[in-house]
Structure formats: structure tokens, C-alpha cells
Amino acid sequence: SNLLVNATVNPDFGQVEADPSELNLSAFETFFEERRPFFVEGKGLFTFTVNCVVVVDCNTGEGLFYSRRIGRAPQLSDTYGDAASPAATKILGAAKLTGRLPNGFSIGVLDAVTDHVNGPGQTTLEPATNFAVVRGNQDFRGGEGSVGFIVTGVNRSLDPSSEPYLHRSAY
């Protein structure tokens, strides 16, 4: 087997190139390319795109799992934040198992935990959150065909100020 385990504790992605400026006036999220080294390595294993041709641009990473949501700007900054509010959520740690077994089965498991972020008056801008994804793919006939699955999960530690705005969990 060819399995690799990676872990990071309190990562600093300050050396990563910044995203281009963009003004998005739509109701839809802007998808940027992942550039953080921990998430770039082995990211192909976590790709599970849906409707690649008509609706979704599959080069952006948009699909069932989008790693840029891990460590993003606090979600409740618009509700409770001010100019001094943090621009990103701190990633406390993450671990990843990726690889391919001799029988053609590829596996990717990722788990990441982000810190709780307070705003003015100690209101929650982003609760402590756990992100998880498991992806498996079995190749057939030397890679001519495949069958795969993906399971994603988000679990948040909500408090009274964040509970009306965010889901406790999503799978």
C-alpha cells in the first residue's frame, strides 16, 4: 500500500499568495483556487464534482467538498462584527490520510478543527468547528472505470448568539 499521513498544528499560511480582489454582489459564494500547502497536497483524492459541464466550473474546486471553507472569514462578522473583527478563523489543527492500495482503491480522510472567534462584546463571530471528509474510489479495468463515494461533515459548538444563524451540524 501507499498511504501517507500528514498533520499540522496551528498552521500559518501567511506565505500563501493572496486571492485577487473581487466584488461579489450575487447571493452565491465566490470559489477561489486552494493554495494552502496542507490542503493542496493530495487534493485530487477529495474531488467529487457534480454536474461539471453545465452548472459548475470544475477547475475552481467547487463540488461537494470545498477546503477553502476551513479557516475562512468568520461567518457572523456581518451580523456582529466591526472593523476590528478578525479576517480569518484560526485553524487549530488538521490531519489527513491519503493514498492508494494495491487493489486500485484510493482513500482520503481529512479532519480539521478551527477555533472559536469572538467579536465585540464577546459575541460569537465563528464557533469552534470540526470539519471532516472521507473519500473513497475504486478503479476498475486499469482505470477505465471507477465507483466512488464521499462523506462530509461539519459540527459546530454553538452558543445562544450563534444558534439562530448557523446549523449545529451538516452532513
Model-predicted segments: where are they?
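Outer membrane beta-barrel
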Residues: 3-70, 90, 94-107
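Signature for the C-terminal beta-barrel architecture of outer-membrane proteins
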Residues: 54-171
